[in-house]
Amino acid sequence: MASKTTSEELKTATALKKRSSDVHAVDHSGNVYKGFQIWTDLAPSVKEEPDLMFAKCIVQAGTDKGNLTCVQIDPPGFDEPFEVPQANAWNVNSLIDPMTYGDIGMLPHTNIPCVLDFLKVRFMKNQIYTTADPLVVAINPFRDLGNTTLDWIVRYRDTFDLSKLAPHVFYTARRALDNLHAVNKSQTIIVSGESGAGKTEATKQIMRYFAAAKTGSMDLRIQNAIMAANPVLEAFGNAKTIRNNNSSRFGRFMQLDVGREGGIKFGSVVAFLLEKSRVLTQDEQERSYHIFYQMCKGADAAMKERFHILPLSEYKYINPLCLDAPGIDDVAEFHEVCESFRSMNLTEDEVASVWSIVSGVLLLGNVEVTATKDGGIDDAAAIEGKNLEVFKKACGLLFLDAERIREELTVKVSYAGNQEIRGRWKQEDGDMLKSSLAKAMYDKLFMWIIAVLNRSIKPPGGFKIFMGMLDIFGFEVFKNNSLEQFFINITNEMLQKNFVDIVFDRESKLYRDEGVSSKELIFTSNAEVIKILTAKNNSVLAALEDQCLAPGGSDEKFLSTCKNALKGTTKFKPAKVSPNINFLISHTVGDIQYNAEGFLFKNKDVLRAEIMEIVQQSKNPVVAQLFAGIVMEKGKMAKGQLIGSQFLSQLQSLMELINSTEPHFIRCIKPNDTKKPLDWVPSKMLIQLHALSVLEALQLRQLGYSYRRPFKEFLFQFKFIDLSASENPNLDPKEAALRLLKSSKLPSEEYQLGKTMVFLKQTGAKELTQIQRECLSSWEPLVSVLEAYYAGRRHKKQLLKKTPFIIRAQAHIRRHLVDNNVSPATVQPAF
């Protein structure tokens, strides 16, 4: 195996194995079924390479019903038998060709090793798309497979019967577009996955599909503006991370007006959860947002002089250890962004303002807020000397009044009634205010660019129905999870509720259509975890907001409040390690530990009302619009300023929008961290399959009557239970299926017959498999006799056919011997 997970990831993956299968390798007589195979995590190769997770083995004769005696067969090269307890054995999908199955849920066994093996076989043969209905799983191949060309778009767009084509992002796009116009209801395609899994690429390909109109008569100006905006959004919202060289650091929801025959008529973009802290600092192997590097490398001499652009290594907000990103040409992308600005119809003055603000944000980082003695404070904030010169340049680039901003960063103003009280900020407070200004200017500039785009692409009368596209991170579980992961995981819990509701609705509809009782369908809701995370009272977010606004609030007090308010729930737990600062949330995907240190600081957008007023009064029209419409109260934080309340309000609006649509799900998965083709790490795959609810989708299908097959497929699969029923031409398929089930003596509560298919509970399907296995096993002696009999008859027939040739050969040999006067007795055998 070419790459490995970290020890922490391997530990997580190992914990996700869950219980083993109900394996039946031995018949009632104590004999092992011939050729019976299992998966196990105790195989020699797994001990040598834990990332492998499972290996395939064949069960040997001599096995009892307790432990299984096995020999590993895949990977090969291990011939020594070893013992496997039943608790470490999983069933194998024998005689199954993964390339003929588009849906994982149709496999006989959907345990974890079977799912991993199924996906691996398809991945290694370049089939990166698979269905786990209602999800489409897309595995990043880290290379161009040539399966997203215009020819492929046309194939999926123009086919009459879409069901005959393999899973693909174009399949999802076509189905969503058909539904949009057939039922006149808005659709949403939700694309999720961890950084580097291919979300951005999948979203781009879906956009290309929608843009590919059958006719060329439509106005392409708006479509071109939407497509051209992608480089700008990526430049301002994407960055190089350890996991991905082009990682989206924000969530994006797009609304598109797509024609019945394709082509994008209008659109709108909503961005949320931009990672503002990246503007200030980056980890050792990471970069800030692409736009900073594009500007510094791509600007000509005149532009550098005009906007005071320095070499990248001279900026304190830029990590000097990582100035380049593999596969990214910053200079070429700078020119692409400039071209995109023109396509978005930005004026020359607006473009100049954008570059000025970007440069000003970087230069503001070079301003050091120093400590001085003043007003009885030993470490009063000050900006003076050379720092003042740099500060004035930065404020000039940001189109802000330098003297007024300097005063707000150093002089503390509070109010007692109508009386103004002036003092000094401490050095650390002044530095925090400066950092908040830099983050806020960048964040609001990003939002302004999106607003400009929307003004040019929105439909004049609003959307009647729309095609939605949500590009969002999946559940994030790191070694150290902070407020960013907390917000991301709240978002995913909301999406998970939507997902479960969809699965339940689809299952219920199938049962109704088939005339089958759905009383067996009982799904588990995540409503409780959402409540303890986001409720107005007695929730984690409520406690965080209260502590942020309370005098003397702290991370420790926030955590203490949570413990007191939520002690009656099982979804919030103190951590075993450092419980004074860590806490656990029982999310849908399992327990996730959060570190509360820094929660309050990150939740406070401490850009004070007085500073926002200065920004709003800027003479530059772009800057003046950045904080337009924000309600302010001097001496206090602006209303709605806390990140948590902004996030929750935005999320609730987003969920209302999505819940009004019919959703489709694409789960993007990264098979390795090396970003190399054909490199497959099972432990990494397992973590993502769990975090993206792929395994849960399969589990949900196991509820109620989890097995459902058309009558003919059912008869073919279980025909040996009763050949007189399955092979009877006088019975229609439904009658034959019922007779076979009666012959099996399967309890009636284990199955129902619908209009076109058989429905079996999971236990019933396993019982039928066992019954058929025992039938075949009991026939084995007879089969052996018949095989020997027919082999003998076949040999005799072949011999009889050859007899004339043998007699003729003998005659020729005898004649040869006589002609040469050779006695037969002198001829020596040749063996």
UniProtKB/Swiss-Prot annotation:
Task: Specify where the region named Actin-binding lies, as residue ranges.
Answer: 663-673
Keywords for the protein's UniProt record, in alphabetical order: Actin-binding, ATP-binding, Cell membrane, Membrane, Motor protein, Myosin, Nucleotide-binding
**Keyword match Chaperone:** no
Ranges for domain Myosin motor: 99-773
- GO terms, biological process: actin filament organization
Q: Which GO terms describe its cellular component?
A: cytoplasm; myosin complex; plasma membrane
| Gene3D superfamilies for this protein | 1.10.10.820, 1.20.5.4820, 1.20.58.530, Kinesin motor domain (3.40.850.10), Myosin VI head, motor domain, U50 subdomain (1.20.120.720)
Q: What is its main location?
A: membrane
Positions of region (Tail): 775-831
Q: How does it sit in the membrane?
A: Peripheral membrane protein
Indicate which residues the UniProt annotation says bind ATP. 193-200
Q: Which GO terms describe its molecular function?
A: actin filament binding; ATP binding; microfilament motor activity
Please give the Pfam families that the UniProt record associates with this protein: Myosin_head (PF00063)
The family classification in the record reads: Belongs to the TRAFAC class myosin-kinesin ATPase superfamily. Myosin family.
What role does this protein play? Myosins are actin-based motor molecules with ATPase activity. Unconventional myosins serve in intracellular movements. Their highly divergent tails are presumed to bind to membranous compartments, which would be moved relative to actin filaments.
Fill in the domain comment: This protein differs from the typical myosin heavy chain structure in having head and tail domains but no discernible neck domain.
Protein name from the UniProt record = Myosin-A
